[in-house]
Amino acid sequence: MLFSLRNSGFFAIGLLLGHAGHADPDTYIRAGAIVDVEAGVVLDGRTIAIEDGVIVAVTPSSEVSIPSGAGLIDLSDYTVLPGLMDAHTHLLSDSDDHGLNSLVVSLPEATINGVKNAAITLQAGFTTVRNVGAPGYADVALRDAIAAGEIAGPRMLVSGPGIGITGGHCSDNNLLPYEYGVTENGVADGPWAIRQMVRQNVKFGVDLIKTCSTGGVLSAGTRLDAVQYTLEELEALVDEAHMHGRKVAVHAHGTAGIRNAILAGADSIEHASFLTEEVIELAKERGTPLVMDIYVTEHILTEGEASGVLPESLEKEREVGQIQRESFSRAHDAGVAMVFGTDSAVYPHGDNARQFSRMVQFGMTPAEAVRSATVLAADLLGVGDQVGRIAEGLQADLVAVSGNPYEDVSILENVEFVMKGGVVYREP
């Protein structure tokens, strides 16, 4: 097995610099089975041909004669899936950096955390992530270093600093007293200040815009149901972002904030906790995907106090956790698009796949849960022509597990093989 970051207390320099993987100019993967995530079926005995990191053929193994000298990866005892995708991550934060603990994390330390957590996330089988909120555009640098092959990590789409109101969830500096005079990177009030902040984020290289239209669980002094940004302000933000070809992810727990975000044209709603039937129908009508992190409540309520989560945040999580899960079930049953996103860093990085079983518990089939982290996530992120399926012409981003994830989706918590762009980062 290649060096396993997930199960080790230190990191191999070779892997972090991107040299632990290997790729052949012509590679064949002999799979015991592959998952067709579009059709929702498992196909036995397939061989995947890869050239220069791209899938060039997917063929029944009985019909394939592998050329002499070609690279062969034998996964005949495994089921192969497209690389998994998480649409709501915070790679530059750690799960013990909550509450007052967050005040001692410098930007350089956050950047180093990002290098570590990117490698852990890739080892867990997540080959693409959308990072929604990071200080100082450090996520832009992390994305670029991964893309250049300088460090190991998933493909990243990044937002830079979240944009939010003074004193809101996206400007969570409420732990500091007034005399410090600290204002976080993304604070903007009023339509024109918001447009300027969108332009600044675009200038510094973001792939998308993240904003907050309600308070949050982990931000001090904010209410989950309180609207942050008026409809006018959100419309200005979305309009400016779309002018620059950037999608918008909106953090929203409360009903009014969710409604405003959908009406403003948001491309996804994050958390979406307090859903009414009216808002569910509005999301369905507008085709607005929901990214609902229904695993994190367990970690917050069992481990949160030890990791610095504030008492008021624990109380808010007790209020919202079960309600969010019930909203998830109702939105799913109504046919709203649901995309896999976990809010990693609230819980330890690498445990992303634990959410699959909760999605099934609260209404999805295993096939739907897998689809939410592949095809649907790729569509939301705008990369469906590159990743998200095992198909000719797409990047060779592949993971393998022992067993059938459509029979037991929890096996995705134990990925045994990871390939990204034709390079192997983990193998049995």
Label each region the model flagged.
Residues 24, 182-264:
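Metal-dependent enolase-superfamily TIM-barrel catalytic cores that perform enediolate-based chemistry
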Residues 78-150, 165-170, 174-176, 232, ...:
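Metal-associated gating/positioning segment near the N- to mid-region
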Residues 104, 243, 247, 312, ...:
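His/Asp/Glu-enriched, well-ordered alpha-helical/loop segment
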Residues 144-162, 224-250, 287, 291-295:
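Alpha-helix-loop-beta-strand connector modules within alpha/beta enzyme cores
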